[in-house]
Amino acid sequence: MPAKRNAAPKDVSSATIGFEAKLWLAADKLRNNMDAAEYKHVVLGLIFLKYISDTFEEHRAKLIAGKGDYAGANAEDPDEYKAENVFWVPADARWSHLQASAKQPTIGKIVDDAMVAIERDNPRLKGVLPKDYARPALDKHRLGELIDVIATIELLASSQPSPQPSPTGRGSEHTELPSPLGRRAGDEGRHRSVDLLGRVYEYFLTRFASAEGKNGGQFYTPSCVVRCLVEMLGPYKGRIYDPCCGSGGMFVQSEKFVEAHGGRLGDISIYGQESNATTRRLAVMNLAIRGIEADFGPEHADTFRRDLHPDLRADFVLANPPFNDSDWFRKDDDVRWQFGVPPKGNANFAWVQHFIHHLAPRGMVGFVLANGSMSSNQSGEGDIRRALIEADLVDCMVAMPGQLFYSTQIPVCLWFLTRNKNDGKRRDRRKQTLFSDARKLDTLIDRVHRELTNADLEKITSTYHAWRGDQRVAGPKTPAAKYADIAGFCKSATTAEIAAHGHVLTPGRYVGAEEVEDDGDPFEEKMPRLVAELLAQFAESAKLEKAIKANLRGLGYGG
């Protein structure tokens, strides 16, 4: 069941959410009876078109001014834009032309022609942009109104406050991102409207995922889950890989993390793969609208049938693979099955072994799986899990609250694996695994969905970093926090303890029960008081029952 349309994420400034929600409400009003799965491509395609047009116009103004490095530059030379990683936008594809034509009955064809022209002149975008705005089913009057709504982003940009760091101290919900190669269209002089477009795109992805319900999970992972994965691993430097990348949320959050911690963006490179062609297009636009470069391979492809990055050894793997996928391609002699051949009826441990196969010698991986993966012994899954534990790969397990996902009510967990628990940067964790039970850490955002707040994320991530002895997160001049087991929440267990539990990785097996604070009242005093309260409630219940029966008799019921 879809979430309420007007539900807004928590822990974000009211001014920011008010701006984004206003745009959403205006755009959603124009949806009329169109299915959300179809309408999202209409809206997101236009937001992307405005982004590249605004970026182009800003750089064009610099070239025309001809100051400094731009002296003598030709503003009509596409190479001047490509050299700065700015998309070239032909005159008839620029936003000013579209907005001026918004009231024309041919606006659908005008938008389609603009998309075709942009793809023609920018090979990186070939096959990415939606080009079906002229279809009869799309109301052209409403399309023109939608163009006017998106145009207001530029007008409202100057009134928005700068994004503030999140209360966790680990980054902002809305931080604008340079590219991993240190190149960024417009750099410091970039207009605020361009920055806000990235935020609007992200917000709209969230709302469309909510509107689509189960199908929304195909392209979107809840931001609190993504943040937890990223902040646990801390991808400061190296190659980041997501073999089932959806709309690219893991990559966007990784870049936010690097920027928030003063890392060098040039030290990060991104690799992704997505099997769904439509979702892959969303990912390309999502990263391009933020100036992030990524290698998605030449086209969409099933990761198990055709690995687009066969030689990649990543420093960080972040993923949210399909839960309990029974319809997947298995090759029994696949080189990736180092710990056992996964069952045909469930791809969970196929994904796990694919992640490990692509890990660098000191690499780390964080991913989401259904809770069954922690305890299942069906079809050899228990043997594979035992092999992973005996290989000392399992670093941390986190049980998550229910109802976090739009696509499923299945309880989920986070796995964190590492090839090297004694890397010299943190304490020696060999033969140890941290278990965290975060099932009680959540906030209800509507009647069917929950999310983790910044405080919840801080509790989970700081516990893990303290357990690892991670000096970087604490800061170079600040002693790392000391770790201690907390009954009901976290426990550091040895491999021997895990073996004694049958190699089950469910945190609840290890953390125990939460300590209940004693109110200090002696039992001899407490029990008579509780009995008196109970008897009083019985008496009140009998009184209410008598009154209800009398009312029913007065209505002719009950004899």
Where are these regions (language model features)?
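Conserved Class I SAM-dependent methyltransferase catalytic core
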Residues: 29, 38-51, 229, 280, ...
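Short, contiguous acidic/charged loop-to-helix segments that flank catalytic cores in large enzymes
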Residues: 33, 328-346, 371-381, 401-407, ...
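Glycine-biased, low-complexity coil/linker segments
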Residues: 169-171, 183-184
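Active-site lining segments that contact anionic ligands and/or coordinate catalytic metals
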Residues: 313-314, 336, 346-348, 362-364, ...
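Extended hydrophobic-aromatic, low-complexity segments
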Residues: 326-330, 366-367, 376-379, 397-398, ...
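Feature representing long, continuous alpha-helical segments
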Residues: 252, 281, 319, 349-353, ...
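Conserved S-adenosyl-L-methionine
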Residues: 215-319, 324-328, 333-336, 345, ...
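Non-catalytic, mostly N-terminal accessory regions of nucleic-acid modification and defense proteins
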Residues: 1-161, 173-174, 189-233, 295-308, ...
